[in-house]
Amino acid sequence: MPDSTHEAAYVADGGVRGFLHLPDGNPVASLALTHGAGGNCTAKLLVDVATAWSARGIAVLRFDLAFRQARESGPPHPSKAPGDRDTVREAVTYLRDRGPGPVLVGGHSYGGRQASMAVSEDSDLAAGLLLLSYPLHPPGKPEKARTAHLPDIAIPTLSVSGTKDPFGTPTELREAIGLIQAGTSFIEITGAGHDLSAHKHHTAERSLEAAVTLFGIDVGTATTE
């Protein structure tokens, strides 16, 4: 089941299902990247990040969480979240078993939240965390902040969020990632809501440049197409 439009290889290996973008030559790092509650691994934002990052030497696996593998539509159920985190771990292991270099993990919205919880439970899981539109709290309910696990994160974390995201303001998110016990960086996308995929936001390119600095990745002189 090739994804010829984006030159990615379909992957179905145990609990891992998705698409793998490989750079020319040996990867200098890898990223396991997953989707939000309403989508799957074909989401435009994930494809854009995978395309841009792989063009600079970073292998990217965009993968479906367990709840999406179980059914094509519908939101995840809170009781099934541990299974989604298991999928995150399996995706990281898949990449680690296939090449040298640091393995990063992350996701958009719910996917980023599950990735963050997975690394809070195991600081050796990945070398860095990417949070795209972290859902800090339900819209209009800042008192229900999802921050309890953040102090247990001990790896560098890059957070990217829009100024119009109802799930958390830039000020709230900066304060939240300040709880993380490692280096952090925050990218504020002016005018963006929860969806960061619009071309004008250049999310893939901006996150890449911040990531190579924060995570110490040597991408050499390759260029982003």
What spans do the regions from the language model cover?
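Serine-hydrolase catalytic machinery in alpha/beta-hydrolase-like enzymes
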Residues: A9-P102, S197-A198, T203
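Short alpha-helix in the alpha/beta-hydrolase fold that links the catalytic acid
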Residues: L46, E143-R146, I155, T169-I177
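Primarily recognizes the serine-hydrolase "nucleophile elbow" in alpha/beta-hydrolase
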Residues: V88-I155
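Short beta-strand/loop motif that positions the catalytic acidic residue
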Residues: I153-A154, S159-S161, D165
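Acidic catalytic loop of the alpha/beta-hydrolase fold
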Residues: T163-G168, D195
